[in-house]
């Protein structure tokens, strides 16, 4: 509802807008392509257009995805200057969201000192994710709730990272964008070091070492196209934002699985989450 969004934004009178709302699932995008395109493309345009009515706005950050690149499966590590594209509706919609953001930046915000950037993160994991068709939540549901775990693409390679990593990057970027809109009104990749670029099967094997209960089967009926290889070049974020990933894959997985274990053991999950954030901020990784 554009009118409601605009009225709410004007009433809030924000200086900073971070747009994270999306239809985020590849398989769901095949089933509901129009919903996906409407949410991820028109939704982005609605946010940016509503922001034009807010004289207080100084910085806008649109969170997209590593899947926004044209992926020809040629082993490329994607840089921010690489071509955008997308085979499935989700990936395509996020590439379009990038283009919509760039158009609004150039058409309406370039001469009014409002910084607009986009952030492209890899496969994030971490406690509190209950989404469907996500590897770690599906593993957790198999262990604690007895659900069957079906794996679509065990050899798919992904840039895995704890959710704390890109969030820290977003906060650094939005601060830089607020202070210097011209220099930082661009796109940034936020991904892991190469040691965290692993196959789905490797992640499952690591999880099995910690939990000893991971049991899965390969989905032989999966005929939906998904990228086999995704890797991000993060030199730009390192150089311009002084950001870099902190957590090893072992620590990333341990932290994630520990959160879910604590949740199912009915521990004080808010306090546990707060301690995990403080540990990350203090660099205890």
Each language-model region and where it sits:
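Short, glycine/charged-enriched secondary-structure capping and boundary segments
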Residues: 31-35, 51, 74-78, 131-135, ...
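A short, amphipathic alpha-helix embedded in the catalytic core of nucleotide-handling enzymes
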Residues: 47, 104, 138-143, 169-173
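N-terminal Rossmann-like NAD(P)+-binding domain of SDR-like oxidoreductases, especially those catalyzing
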Residues: 1-121, 125, 258, 272, ...
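The catalytic Tyr-centered alpha-helix of NAD(P)H-dependent dehydrogenases
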Residues: 85-93, 97, 132-136, 159-163
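Residues in well-ordered alpha-helical elements
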Residues: 3, 15, 27, 34, ...
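Proline-centered turn/helix-capping motifs that create local helix->coil transitions or kinks
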Residues: 69-74, 108-114, 129, 144, ...
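C-terminal substrate-binding subdomain of Rossmann-fold SDR/epimerase-dehydratase oxidoreductases
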Residues: 123, 143-285
């Amino acid at each position: 509802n554009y009118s409601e969004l605009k009225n709410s934004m004007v009433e809030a009178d924000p200086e900073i807008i971070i747009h994270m709302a999306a239809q985020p699932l590849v398989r769901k995008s095949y089933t509901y392509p129009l919903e996906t395109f409407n949410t991820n493309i028109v939704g982005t345009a609605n946010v940016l257009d509503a922001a034009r009515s807010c004289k207080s706005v100084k910085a806008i950050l649109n969170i997209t995805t590593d899947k926004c690149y044209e992926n020809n499966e040629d082993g490329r590590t994607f840089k921010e200057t690489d071509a955008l594209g997308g085979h499935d509706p989700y990936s395509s919609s996020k590439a379009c969201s990038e283009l919509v953001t760039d158009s609004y930046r150039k058409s309406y915000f370039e001469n009014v000192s409002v910084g607009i950037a986009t952030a492209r993160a890899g496969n994030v994991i971490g406690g509190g994710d209950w989404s469907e068709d996500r590897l770690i939540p599906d593993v957790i549901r198999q262990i604690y709730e007895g659900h069957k775990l079906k794996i679509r693409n065990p050899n798919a390679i992904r840039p895995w990272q704890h959710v704390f990593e890109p969030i820290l990057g977003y906060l650094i970027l939005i601060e830089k964008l607020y202070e210097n809109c011209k220099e930082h009104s661009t796109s940034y990749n936020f991904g892991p070091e190469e040691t965290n670029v692993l196959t789905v099967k490797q992640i499952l094997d690591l999880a099995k070492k910690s939990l000893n209960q991971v049991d899965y089967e390969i989905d032989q009926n999966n005929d939906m196209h998904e990228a086999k290889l995704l890797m991000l070049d993060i030199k730009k974020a390192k150089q311009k934002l002084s950001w870099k990933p902190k957590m090893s894959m072992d620590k990333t997985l341990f932290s994630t699985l520990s959160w879910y274990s604590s949740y199912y053991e009915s521990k004080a999950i808010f306090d546990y989450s707060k301690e995990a954030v403080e540990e990350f901020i203090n660099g205890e990784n």
